[in-house]
């Protein structure tokens, strides 16, 4: 199994002081020794800038600032939402920023042969609000160099109140197009309040995305989206388990695809007892099956309040074989982390994240955040938990032949004693059996966070 080293601090661009709210969400490693990561940092003037990291041949290069779009405000508030690499050194990054008029806009930026280009504003669909816009690109997936798809949300110009709509946005042969409004299911509310979880693209122009919308009864429903041959299809509604509440509040947060039209999604819903449970859904040959309730650990409370962080907590190395992780509330009202495995097409009962000695709980800001599988039943994960003194710590956990081991605390840079409430492992990718990389953040002082990288080789 992989042996993890101590974490190393991420040196910030000149004048950088720290990471706002410890935000370093994005990591993509298309091959062993080649990774890109992204987040946000505060510059010397306290402005929020986009942060980019690139690993070449196993070595992290000095971090760089992502140049904001030309119409960005004085404080661009650059916030990277996701990053994906088609091949080593050829990636795309997406997110949101503040323009000079105070609107929040979406952006995209490309890395070409390890050189990051400046970010450009997303051209929103016709009918987007001109004033008071709040738009952002939430997720991106690149199937090959220069071929990516992304999903996000924006405000339309409906009166008297703008509606929250979703959009898709494709990069084809290195050129990003304009955003297109997602066609929501026919039972959607006039304001569908679209929320987007993730997109996954196993091949160029063939993607699946998940999220949620609100129907005419003000019930939140799971939203499923498919792109086939470069064309996005109208959204469909996830069918829920038989024990779902009439007001099930279903939402899908993560998706992973093994091949085009063969994907797995994770989410949550409320059952008829009022308990928030986890669910899995499978797309087979382009058809999404009814969601299936997760079986939580025996220690789960009557309402386990299942929660997924939505970064990279699901990994499917082959059809019918997945591993995932999240958080739940146990019968003692303590927040715990959990793992759940799909083996040869059958989801097993979830297991509790095993914590180091002296710890009782993962904590409200703890649990499993990132999962990456090299092969079926052989995975690694990043998590956070509360130590015996009540401080949050970062944890790496290895799964060997479908058995999750006890997690190992990450040794933080410069003698730091906690990752804080906003820190921990955000991204983790394993490219081979023994080669894994993780990124995250930790609390460096009472008011500041810094980034870290940690690896196995």
What does each model-identified segment do?
Residues 1-457:
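Residue-level hotspots at or immediately adjacent to binding/recognition sites across diverse folds
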């Amino acid at each position: 199994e992989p042996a993890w080293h101590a974490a190393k601090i991420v040196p910030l661009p000149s004048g950088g002081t720290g990471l706002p709210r410890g935000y370093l969400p994005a990591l993509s490693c298309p091959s062993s020794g080649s990774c890109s990561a992204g987040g946000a940092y505060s510059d010397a003037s306290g402005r929020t800038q986009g942060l980019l990291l690139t690993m070449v041949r196993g070595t992290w290069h000095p971090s760089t600032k992502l140049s904001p779009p030309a119409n960005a405000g004085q404080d661009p508030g650059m916030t990277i939402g996701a990053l994906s690499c088609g091949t080593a050194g050829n990636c795309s990054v997406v997110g949101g920023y503040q323009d000079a008029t105070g609107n929040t806009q979406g952006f995209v930026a490309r890395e070409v042969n390890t050189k990051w280009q400046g970010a450009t504003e997303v051209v929103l669909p016709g009918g987007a609000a001109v004033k008071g816009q709040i738009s952002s690109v939430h997720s991106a997936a690149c199937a090959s160099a220069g071929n990516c798809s992304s999903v996000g949300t924006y405000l339309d110009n409906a009166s008297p109140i703008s509606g929250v709509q979703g959009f898709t946005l494709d990069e084809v042969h290195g050129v990003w197009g304009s955003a297109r409004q997602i066609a929501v299911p026919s039972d959607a509310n006039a304001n569908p309040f679209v929320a987007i979880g993730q997109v996954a693209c196993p091949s160029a122009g063939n993607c699946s995305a998940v999220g949620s919308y609100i129907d005419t009864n003000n019930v939140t429903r799971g939203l499923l989206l498919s792109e086939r041959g470069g064309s996005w299809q109208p959204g469909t509604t996830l069918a829920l388990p038989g024990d779902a509440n009439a007001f099930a509040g279903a939402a899908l947060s993560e998706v992973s695809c093994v091949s085009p039209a063969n994907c797995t999604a994770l989410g949550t819903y409320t059952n008829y007892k009022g308990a928030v449970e986890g669910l899995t859904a499978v797309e087979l040959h382009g058809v999404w099956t009814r969601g299936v309730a997760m079986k939580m650990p025996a220690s789960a409370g009557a309402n386990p309040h299942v929660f997924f962080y939505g970064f990279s907590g699901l990994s499917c190395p082959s059809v019918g074989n997945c591993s995932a992780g999240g958080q739940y509330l146990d019968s003692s009202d303590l927040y715990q982390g959990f793992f759940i495995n799909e083996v040869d097409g059958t989801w097993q009962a979830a297991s509790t994240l095993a914590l180091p000695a002296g710890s009782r709980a993962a904590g409200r800001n703890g649990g499993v955040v990132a999962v990456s599988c090299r092969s079926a039943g052989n995975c690694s994960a990043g998590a956070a938990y509360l130590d015996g003194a009540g401080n949050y710590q970062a944890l790496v956990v290895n799964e060997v032949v479908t058995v999750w081991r006890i997690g190992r605390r990450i040794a933080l840079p410069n003698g730091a004693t906690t990752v804080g409430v906003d820190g921990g492992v955000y991204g983790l990718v394993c490219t081979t059996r023994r080669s894994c990389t993780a990124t995250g953040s930790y609390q460096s002082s009472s008011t500041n966070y810094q980034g870290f990288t940690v690896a196995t080789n």
